[in-house]
Amino acid sequence: PILLTRNLSVAKSWIRSHARGTERYGMVAASGAQRLKPYAIDVRFNIRPKDWFLNGPTDTRSSWYLEDVATEFHIQGLELDWVLMTWDADLQYSRSGWKYRKFRASKWMQVKNEERQRYLLNAYRVLLTRARQGMIIFIPEGDSADPTRSKELYDPTFEFLQTLDI
């Protein structure tokens, strides 16, 4: 199954409730997802992939804790049974096609270089194909008090994914 939510707590509960026995689960995000920090998702924190993938459920560094997030660089070529995919405003759906952005200091900047656009799209492709059994996609509600996380940055992507019956 693939589900879609705007509530990170719901996403974490769903992932935990579906994993059985030794099935592995974890949280992933694109390396450019800079504005998920208000949710304690910081892609700049460099996980140790060995600890994240191999350590057990009692180790806070492991994927089991759903605290440290793996990016496309950490997870490429590897799979988890269940994935909590976090989606930021670096890749936004619009009626005219995808909008590609990079966060710099205090605002989102448009990515105009086609090669960098392909890289960003491929980062999301990598992340969206890491789950063996199921996935839940978390897209934030947005915050009208924060122009770097406004609802307008997140709503179009959420609404588009809803049309796909996710």
PLM features per residue range, with description:
Residues 65-166:
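C-terminal accessory regions
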Residues 1-97:
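Conserved helicase/translocase motor-coupling segment
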